[in-house]
């Protein structure tokens, strides 16, 4: 019996990897333009980090984490999200002492959640995320959202929308929390067991419930906008004003809460409106987390960030029929004819690669026709033919596969000649 891939994971094969590499390259490029620096954290962390950083009332912590005991009886967890590890690194490495605040970081990496696999949702998945830590300026909120929107636009997506809300500061959240408890408590028995347990711990999460979203009490629940104090309302208005100035359209949704406990003030999601995208329309989401650095052991430092699923981005690209400019060709294929030419062909391929070109050659002693077929499949720009006649003359026959033109090139200058033609 053959061993198969675990459920909820996928192999990304040659031919598809190039798409991922292109997306990751574009992510790095936009982060360069916004002056975000890459950070790489461990794939596993101490479980306590996520209990404190994500929140013990969240679905992630209660149902979805891959946790295990190591041989030293330490509880470790494969990271289910990227913000808490980045903040842990920020605190542990004392980045808050850097004079150039805010600290602007990005990551591209694999995350792990035990969820029911479906289209766009895997148990191992890749996130691109950014974190800006150290500023309470609404301009950084707008910048984070604008970066995400510009990235999607740069990928060619047109059918996207930004959904925006504010959860307010700690005082606003507490006032809203009390109102939600008073609203739901008399009829909480009509809700699912998850919502019943959330009532006292984090009633805001009831608004995020998928099972009870059509319950009549959901439509009449107190809105956070009714409980924003003056400072929170001014902050929210400023974020909206800046987004409008940046030509970033958005919709306000007072029921948007996000699934993590650390959010305050700005929260947002970016969704696909493309036909055929599927039921899960959220491409990315994020928000402000002003208490998280302190919760993880650092000084009182505000922060904001977002994370996006690369898998869902690829779904959106397919839904909008977007073809990205991927490079699937090689520069040169070396055809060797006869035993005498084989070793020399290996040297020619080596010299071409040394000159910076992508090169392939035959390793199966096939006839010339079969070797040319391989060159076609690999979309070679040039084919170099080396046989005994060419060796005797000290030349190589070079064919331009786009024009069909052929020429003879001296063997001792061949690599530099082909390199010049391709530059």
From Swiss-Prot:
InterPro entries: aa-tRNA-synth_II, aa-tRNA-synth_II/BPL/LPL, Anticodon-bd, Anticodon-bd_dom_sf, His-tRNA-ligase, HisRS-like_core, HisRS/HisZ, HisRS_anticodon. Keywords: Aminoacyl-tRNA synthetase, ATP-binding, Cytoplasm, Ligase, Nucleotide-binding, Protein biosynthesis. PROSITE patterns: AA_TRNA_LIGASE_II. Homodimer. It comes from Bacillus cereus (strain ATCC 14579 / DSM 31 / CCUG 7414 / JCM 2152 / NBRC 15305 / NCIMB 9373 / NCTC 2599 / NRRL B-3711). It comes from the Bacteria. Pfam families: HGTP_anticodon, tRNA-synt_His. One of its GO terms (cellular component) is cytoplasm. It is found in: Cytoplasm. GO terms for molecular function: ATP binding; catalytic activity, acting on a protein; histidine-tRNA ligase activity; transferase activity. It catalyses: tRNA(His) + L-histidine + ATP = L-histidyl-tRNA(His) + AMP + diphosphate + H(+). One of its GO terms (biological process) is histidyl-tRNA aminoacylation. It is an enzyme of class 6 (ligase). The keyword Protein biosynthesis applies. Its EC number is 6.1.1.21. Its main location: cytoplasm. Belongs to the class-II aminoacyl-tRNA synthetase family. HAMAP family: His_tRNA_synth. This is Histidine--tRNA ligase 2.
